[in-house]
Amino acid sequence: MRNIQIALTKGRLEKHVIPLFEQIGIDCSELKNKGRKLVFQSKNTDISFILVKAVDVATYVEHGVADIGVVGKDILMENEKDIYEMLDLGVGVCKFCVASIPTYNPKSYRKKCIATKYPHITSNYFHNKGEDVEIIKIEGSVEIAPILGLADAIVDIVETGKTLQENGLIVFEEMYSISARMIVNKAALKTKKDEIFSIINMMEQEILSGK
């Protein structure tokens, strides 16, 4: 088996995904005791893992540094990359939502100002609804934007809704459901076809058996 390099997202999604790899027989012990390391070798397979920021996973896969990547659908929707999206892993499930303070009126004809970390997704969503909105990109916590009057509402990923609730915001629209996706480098799918499809097929069977 030729070596397969897999790029994973550091943080919350990583914790959802590691058990899936373990369930298909891939040793992930180094990942679970990583310290400050960012590159890890599976002890029982020719598979190595790299841990990178979520926004960089698709970039590493697109440029062939990683053969396979696992990343949230939000990253793929916001950043168009020349990769193959192969499998919905069904973990890390969240929703894109429009949220604001209780006095927000989503039916108002006035041009709205929306704060978000995801300007591309937000622009497409409101464009498809026929609404002209001003979009302000914010890198940090967007919840504060409608509270301080910077924006009428926000578009953000909501998992439990606890952060919104703690800041006095409510969900007005659920836009899209998102989850972790397995992506593959286009060239690698040709040169390492058997190895990659072996991982994908085992993962797919594991997901189906768990439903």
Swiss-Prot record:
Gene: hisG
Listed Pfam families: HisG
Enzyme Commission number(s): 2.4.2.17
Molecular function, one GO term: ATP phosphoribosyltransferase activity
Protein name: ATP phosphoribosyltransferase
Quaternary structure and interacting proteins, as annotated: Heteromultimer composed of HisG and HisZ subunits.
GO biological process per UniProt: L-histidine biosynthetic process
Chemical reaction(s) catalysed: 1-(5-phospho-beta-D-ribosyl)-ATP + diphosphate = 5-phospho-alpha-D-ribose 1-diphosphate + ATP
Lineage, highest ranks first: Bacteria, Bacillati, Bacillota, Bacilli, Bacillales
Signal peptide limits: none
Keywords: Amino-acid biosynthesis, ATP-binding, Cytoplasm, Glycosyltransferase, Histidine biosynthesis, Nucleotide-binding, Transferase
Pathway membership, UniProt: Amino-acid biosynthesis; L-histidine biosynthesis; L-histidine from 5-phospho-alpha-D-ribose 1-diphosphate: step 1/9
Subcellular location: Cytoplasm
Gene Ontology CC entries for this record: cytoplasm
Annotated family: Belongs to the ATP phosphoribosyltransferase family. Short subfamily.
Annotated function: Catalyzes the condensation of ATP and 5-phosphoribose 1-diphosphate to form N'-(5'-phosphoribosyl)-ATP (PR-ATP). Has a crucial role in the pathway because the rate of histidine biosynthesis seems to be controlled primarily by regulation of HisG enzymatic activity.
Originating organism: Bacillus anthracis
Domain topic, free-text comment: Lacks the C-terminal regulatory region which is replaced by HisZ.
